[in-house]
């Protein structure tokens, strides 16, 4: 599985991991777990709040781990990793693939950390593992300050057409969303038709819909849902769709936008300075 990228936050976690090893030349799962606690941004703030008081205990455990093992070379770290870390990283990629995403993030790795047996699963209580499971599985709502939103970009990829949905698009959009995403989204979007100003944008490629975004579907001043076919997600289409909707909302006088049940949080952080509420 090579067709994926790593989010900036997870990359920082991996950098913290390598920079915190002291004289040990191999990475263990507990090193990654401690790095996630120390990263302390957005969703990992909750992890920091819950576990930072135990960081010295974790460091002591890490100091007593073997210093001479046969490590595995890998694409994530310069430093070799032990077998458990290799298994955790492979598991996190499997979790990512099941969500149809192309970016490996800290949530996928955290889920794998509490699933694959290691010193991390040994030191965590059942209650602590349950807390992490809830943290990973709870959707977050984000807020965007539209007063500071000026990133609308008209320089779109000329290979794709982004336009407002028309009444004639109803059934094509419904079928596309139901087939590639889910029927709940499809039903919600279809309920907006007919209208003189449909709050939905479509991405057209070779006369076919390959993506969409919407606003006001989940409530006034709310953004979402949004979806782009997996094979087109590295063309900045998602960002363009997001910008279109947020710009519409800003122009009509909205001061904020709410992104409900946000998926890739870092995507929204980078594109529109969204933050968890």
Predicted features and spans:
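A conserved beta-strand-loop-helix scaffold within acyl/acetyltransferase catalytic domains
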Residues: 181-229
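Conserved active-site alpha-helix within GNAT-family acetyltransferase domains
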Residues: 262-277
